[in-house]
Design a protein with these regions (language model features):
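Cysteine endopeptidase catalytic domains of the caspase/legumain-like
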Residues: 1-171
Length: 171
């Protein structure tokens, strides 16, 4: 309800950052966002990622960058032996890929790792560090989206493996 009412321009890039938990439907792989205090039993309080992507596609902005630092879990009542991978984009996106870019800190069903030296999530720490300039790979004073993605992907993967011996794959 709120997003479409925001007056943007066709030249505006919108950035949305979400941290918390996500639920993966074990029939479809569809991801829903859950409030930090939500429970699997209270699925009515989830918000469909697909719905958010559609709203961003319809918004009057040039591009939207959606950054997600989520711990993912399977939907309630699902078979623990059957794991359906999260589906981050929808087949009927109709131009969405050109206008909505996803940066996902944890692409699999697992807890997103914390990073104690930074006192935040591993993805969030390196996302912020990259935005402050560490991702400026060509040292021209500008952090491009591709540079940020490459930097965050490399750092999160390496630190997760070293810290916990458990890879946290970004997307």
């Amino acid at each position: 309800q709120w997003l479409p009412k925001q007056s943007g321009s066709q030249q505006t890039t919108t950035y949305i950052y979400v941290t918390g938990r996500g639920v993966v439907d074990q029939e479809t792989g569809v991801v829903s966002l859950m409030p930090y205090d939500g429970t699997l039993g209270g699925v009515s309080r989830t918000f469909s990622l697909t719905r958010l992507q559609r709203a961003l596609t319809k918004a009057s902005v040039k591009q939207a960058v959606l950054m997600l630092d989520l711990s993912l879990e399977s939907s309630a009542g699902s078979d623990p032996g059957r794991v359906v991978p999260p589906r981050w984009t929808q087949p009927d996106s109709g131009g969405e890929a050109d206008r909505v870019m996803l940066m996902v800190g944890n692409s699999g069903i697992q807890e997103a790792q914390a990073y104690q030296p930074g006192q935040q999530g591993l993805f969030t720490y390196f996302l912020l560090k990259g935005l402050r300039g560490a991702a400026d790979l060509d040292k021209n004073g500008n952090v491009l989206t591709g540079e940020l993605c490459a930097y965050v992907h490399g750092q999160v993967g390496a630190v997760a493996q070293a810290q916990a011996g458990n890879p946290q794959q970004t997307l």
